[in-house]
Amino acid sequence: MKATVLTLAVLFLTGSQARHFWQQDEPPQTPWDRVKDLVTVYVEALKDSGKDYVSQFEGSALGKQLNLKLLDNWDSVTSTVSKLREQLGPVTQEFWDNLEKETEGLRQEMSKDLEEVKAKVQPYLDDFQKKWQEEMELYRQKVEPLRAELHEGTRQKLHELHEKLSPLGEEVRDRARAHVDALRTHLAPYSDELRQRLAARLEALKENGGARLAEYHAKASEHLSTLSEKAKPALEDLRQGLLPVLESFKVSFLSALEEYTKKLSTQ
């Protein structure tokens, strides 16, 4: 029930930051951790699906005719890519840490605004949860006498039971909709307030902190340049690791093409 209330609240508060109000049950996860998790899942899925596609191709008539032996080199390619990820990990972590450090002040100001709005809307959320629980209890009491009829199980009884339950379901739906509308009405001013505060922060940063914006831009550019320089050795290692695989692919393909050409000439 609590999760339902919190989910509804999020629908009325704009911005992805609003969901962090009530994430108290899970350990905090840094943006970098979320990025790493996403990239890891994506790369692993891509690697597995890619191997499946290669396997299907080599099993096809054309794949057997070309005999490129792509699967023989697959482990080498994935090993090289994994090595690249390991080498770039610390470099990218450093870039993200620097970016977080540079924007710490702005993020603290925005977090303060969010906490203030949260404190204002909490009573409305508590009231909504209380009314929702009361509605569910009332519905349960009305449905309880019908359970005995359900056990009889005849088609006629089931049809009659459905006719009795339908009005109750519609009543609960209408009352829940009324509570949701009331909650939306109560939260609307605070949602607008949150938007206005955020807009004011950004406008102040734009008008009075032009130098800060320029500084953020300069530092971000500097960090990206540093990341690019530090990534060059790892990318070169990747290129060197892939060269034997590409050369093997080239030789196999040309050999298959030559053999196919000879077959055409003899026909």
Swiss-Prot record:
Signal peptide extent: 1-18
Gene Ontology CC terms: chylomicron; endocytic vesicle; extracellular vesicle; high-density lipoprotein particle; low-density lipoprotein particle; spherical high-density lipoprotein particle; very-low-density lipoprotein particle
Record's keyword terms, sorted: Cholesterol metabolism, HDL, Lipid metabolism, Lipid transport, Lipoprotein, Oxidation, Palmitate, Phosphoprotein, Repeat, Secreted, Signal, Steroid metabolism, Sterol metabolism, Transport
Domain of life: Eukaryota
GO biological process terms held by the UniProt record: acylglycerol homeostasis; adrenal gland development; amyloid-beta formation; blood vessel endothelial cell migration; cellular response to lipoprotein particle stimulus; cholesterol biosynthetic process; cholesterol efflux; cholesterol homeostasis
Main location: secreted
Location in the cell: Secreted
Residue numbers carrying Methionine sulfoxide: 110, 136
Processing and modification events after translation: Glycosylated.
Keyword check for Lipid metabolism: yes
InterPro entries: ApoA_E (IPR000074), Apolipoprotein_A1/A4/E (IPR050163)
GO MF, one annotated term: heat shock protein binding
Sequence repeat spans: 68-89, 90-111, 112-122, 123-144, 145-166, 167-188, 189-210, 211-232, 233-243, 244-267
Residue ranges of the region described as 10 X approximate tandem repeats: 68-267
Subunit and interaction comment: Homodimer. Interacts with APOA1BP and CLU. Component of a sperm activating protein complex (SPAP), consisting of APOA1, an immunoglobulin heavy chain, an immunoglobulin light chain and albumin. Interacts with NDRG1. Interacts with SCGB3A2. Interacts with NAXE and YJEFN3.
Function: Participates in the reverse transport of cholesterol from tissues to the liver for excretion by promoting cholesterol efflux from tissues and by acting as a cofactor for the lecithin cholesterol acyltransferase (LCAT). As part of the SPAP complex, activates spermatozoa motility.
Homology family: Belongs to the apolipoprotein A1/A4/E family.
Protein name as it appears in the record: Apolipoprotein A-I
Taxonomic path: Eukaryota, Metazoa, Chordata, Craniata, Vertebrata
Gene giving rise to this polypeptide: APOA1
